[in-house]
Design a protein with these regions (language model features):
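Short C-terminal tail/terminal secondary-structure segment
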Residues: 2-3, 147, 235-251
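Substrate-binding pocket helix/loop in short-chain dehydrogenase/reductase
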Residues: 98-99, 103-108, 204
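Alpha-helical segment proximal to the catalytic Tyr-Lys
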Residues: 127, 170-175, 232
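C-terminal helical subdomain
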Residues: 181, 202-230, 234, 241-243
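Active-site helix of classical SDR
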Residues: 122, 158, 166
Length: 251
């Protein structure tokens, strides 16, 4: 599976790594020979993931919306690996609700994790990368951040914020640090499975030109490319990987 020789030995932090896109991405970078440090709020799931994948270099249980938790996770990575070369900020949540019935506490929680967590992790990584003279910051946004989707007003707004955060950081940290975000469409993750019945999934697939959900491994492959030297001139980009879902009207 390994394709990018330059990723061998790179110190990579991946948040939201106990399942879904984060876990698939961690596996991909480990296959590339990177030193993978995984982060997730679910300590039990994180420990099970680390046990299943002894090739991962280490882990830290952290709530990315808590600044002290984030600082502690980076400190642990510093202790184990001596720094960071690549951040893949992927932790996030979504809760299906119509906009007029979203409790404000839920709105704040989604924003704090999906956008606040991206900011806190990027700040810690960016400071380290700028000091050492290089690095790559990658964030998971969403096609929901590029256009309106019903029932996810808080999630959509948070992911739109991630896209603009990406562009701002890319401008501020260039040319030393590259910053990009990935905008997946529908991905068949445990989170998606929990929210959609089989009938709902089939209906969604009918509206996607490629007629299927993405596999988490396909998102991980894009992250590997964006961290590689082949992407060395790409920064400030929001890259869609959605099977053509947002290309235009499809029927």
């Amino acid at each position: 599976m390994a394709r990018y020789e330059e990723l061998k030995g790179k110190r990579v932090m991946i948040t939201g790594a106990a399942s879904g896109i984060g876990l698939a991405t961690a596996r991909r970078f480990a296959a590339e020979g990177a030193k993978v440090f995984i982060v997730d709020y679910n300590k039990k799931a994180l420990e099970a993931t680390q046990k299943e994948h002894p090739e991962f270099a280490g882990f830290s249980a952290a709530d990315v919306s808590d600044e002290e938790n984030v600082k502690a996770a980076f400190a642990e990575m510093d202790r184990l690996l001596g720094g960071i070369d690549v951040l893949i900020s992927n932790a996030g949540i979504s809760i299906r609700s119509d906009a007029l019935n979203i409790p404000y506490a839920q709105w704040k929680k989604v924003m704090d994790i999906n956008l606040g967590g991206m900011f806190l992790c990027a700040k810690e990584a960016g400071r380290r990368m700028k000091a050492r003279g290089g690095g790559v910051i990658l964030m998971t946004a969403s096609s929901n951040g590029t256009e309106g989707h019903r029932w996810y007003a808080d999630y959509n707004a948070s992911k739109a914020g991630v896209i603009l955060l990406t562009k701002t950081l890319a401008l501020e940290l260039a040319p030393v640090v590259r910053v990009n975000c990935v905008c997946p469409g529908y991905v068949l993750t445990p989170m998606q499975r929990a929210e959609y019945t089989d009938e709902m999934l089939a209906k969604v697939n009918e509206g996607i030109p490629m007629k299927r959900h993405a596999a988490p491994e396909e998102i991980g492959a894009l992250y590997a490319f964006l961290a590689s030297n082949d992407a060395r001139y790409i920064t400030g980009a929001d890259i869609r990987i959605d099977g053509g879902e947002t290309a235009g009207l499809y029927s």
